[in-house]
Amino acid sequence: MTQYNLLEIYSIKENLKEYDLDDSVTEKISELFNLLNISNTRSKNMRKDKNNCIENGKWMKKELFKPTQIEKKEGIEEELDNLRALLNKLVENNYEEQKDKIIDCVKSIFDIDDDEKYIKVMERFYTLVINNQRYSKTYSQVYLILLDKYIVLEEYQSIFINRYNDIIHKIEYIDPDENYDEYCRINKLNFQRKCLLSFIISCVECEIYSFNELLHIINGLFDMLDNNLKSANHQNINEEIVENIFTVMQQGRHLILNEVCKYDIIDKIKNYSILNLKDNSGYSNRMKFKMLDILDLYK
């Protein structure tokens, strides 16, 4: 086999003017083009001049790109954006450092003359809470500090429980094959609902809310499930109710075990775990196994 070094290859490249491939090689290449269903002709690239727009036979100068001007927020909106950024950075590891920055930022907001400043702060905090379940305890600790520091916030203290009690009655379901985008939207709402419930449980732990308020939520979930057990059309909604029951029974376990009502609650779960599916068309094996998982937590 003939071999060439690099210098020889460069020399051949510089001096080569024309070279015809053997017919057999050409045929093979053509066969490849046909198999791949691609063209073997090179399209001519038309060079475009910067000023190549023509109107009425005249060259028109291309309009210069104008960057989008982002309006800079000022006053309370700027401070609220700062608060949102600080809250988003809040994790367990930086709690001590970050909480002081958050408190200072909230003070700056409350110093501003704005009739809606308190509810605006609460809305920023609410948005944080419903989108991150992992740090619910950390968020409740910051919330407790703000409540102790600003008595006026007690007027808005029930906002989280009230909203949970509202959205728990708005559970939806859609088949992903029917509308996948809507299915994803509903899944996000389901996740946010459980995040909010986790935060409420954490608030009970640090005594922002009482256990009776949590018990009211638990009994409400049981009532919703009981009302829908006979309805096959509610089976998917019932599964989401059970997911919420599991959340409160798992994350609120130590709270429940310290209360006398634990016996009634556990008995209720036991009854669900042995329900006959044929007699309860709104119930499913998935829910049944979830109830058994809860019982394992309380052994």
Show the residue positions of the predicted features.
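Intrinsically disordered, low-complexity segments
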Residues: 32-35
